[in-house]
Structure formats: C-alpha cells, structure tokens
C-alpha cells in the first residue's frame, strides 16, 4: 500500500490540472479576444499596404507607359514636322533659286539686247562716218581724175549718193548671186 499511497510523479494532481486548465482557458480567451484581433489588424494593414503599394506601382507603371507613349507620339510628331519644315525649306530654296535664275536670264537678255542696240548704233554711226569719208575721198579722187571741180556741196553730195547707191546695188546683186 505504500506504493499505492505514493503518487506517481508523472501524473499531476487533479486540482492542479483543473486550475491550470482554467488559467489556460482564461489566457486563451484573452488571446482570442484581444491579442489575435490586434495581430489580425496588423496583418490586414500590412496586406492592404502591400496591395496598395502594388496598385500604386501598377498605376505608376501605367502612367509611365502612357507618358512614354505620349513622348514617342510627340517625338514622331516632331520628326514629321521637322521633315515638313525641311521639305518647305527645300521647296522655298528651289523657288528662290528659280527666281534668281529667271532674274539672271532677264538681266542677261536685257544686257544682250542693250549690247545689240549699242552695236547696231555703232554700226550705223560707222556706216555714216564711212559714207562721209568715202564721199569726201571719192569727191577728191573724182575731181583729180575728171579734172572737174566738185567743190559745190550739193553737186558733190549727188555724185557721192549716186556712187554709193550703185555700190549698194552691186553688193545686192553679188549677195543674191551667192
């Protein structure tokens, strides 16, 4: 009996188990009522923050993509506008060059026309001068050959004019014969 009276050290006393169980239930109640909701709230806040961060990151990424697309569109628009400006400048340059060429051609034609007029005027002046000189020389020569004085100007002019008319007629016949 001695062995029966002695309690097994591995089996606890019933009252100890009961008090320990009640303490455990109270601690469990306090943990479930106050501690677990606090942890749940912290976990929920952290999850919301992470999800919000992900949403913000997605929004920022979408915004960055939209900004990049807008930038690319503006860049393409700027390229097209630059190309248009280059084409307009090239066209304007060609117009200016054509205008300068037209002006140069007109100026060249004007200078050529003036030169022809000047040459024609000089030729006419030379013809008149040569006629006068030829007339004077012919008169002097004729008066020496004929022995008749041609000092009368009207008479000398008639002789010279007749001589030059005969000369022109002879040139016309030789020119037509050629």
Curated annotation (Swiss-Prot):
It is a single-pass membrane protein. Disulfide bonds: none annotated. Gene3D superfamilies: F1F0 ATP synthase subunit B, membrane domain. It is found in: Cell membrane. One of its GO terms (cellular component) is plasma membrane. It comes from the Bacteria. Keywords: ATP synthesis, Cell membrane, CF(0), Hydrogen ion transport, Ion transport, Membrane, Transmembrane, Transmembrane helix, Transport. Pfam families: ATP-synt_B. The chain crosses the membrane at residues 19-39. The keyword Transmembrane applies. GO terms for molecular function: proton-transporting ATP synthase activity, rotational mechanism; proton-transporting ATPase activity, rotational mechanism. The keyword Cell membrane applies. InterPro entries: ATP_synth_B-like_membr_sf, ATP_synth_b/b'su_bac/chlpt, ATP_synth_F0_bsu_bac, ATP_synthase_B_chain. F-type ATPases have 2 components, F(1) - the catalytic core - and F(0) - the membrane proton channel. F(1) has five subunits: alpha(3), beta(3), gamma(1), delta(1), epsilon(1). F(0) has three main subunits: a(1), b(2) and c(10-14). The alpha and beta chains form an alternating ring which encloses part of the gamma chain. F(1) is attached to F(0) by a central stalk formed by the gamma and epsilon chains, while a peripheral stalk is formed by the delta and b chains. Belongs to the ATPase B chain family. F(1)F(0) ATP synthase produces ATP from ADP in the presence of a proton or sodium gradient. F-type ATPases consist of two structural domains, F(1) containing the extramembraneous catalytic core and F(0) containing the membrane proton channel, linked together by a central stalk and a peripheral stalk. During catalysis, ATP synthesis in the catalytic domain of F(1) is coupled via a rotary mechanism of the central stalk subunits to proton translocation. This is ATP synthase subunit b. It comes from Kocuria rhizophila (strain ATCC 9341 / DSM 348 / NBRC 103217 / DC2201).
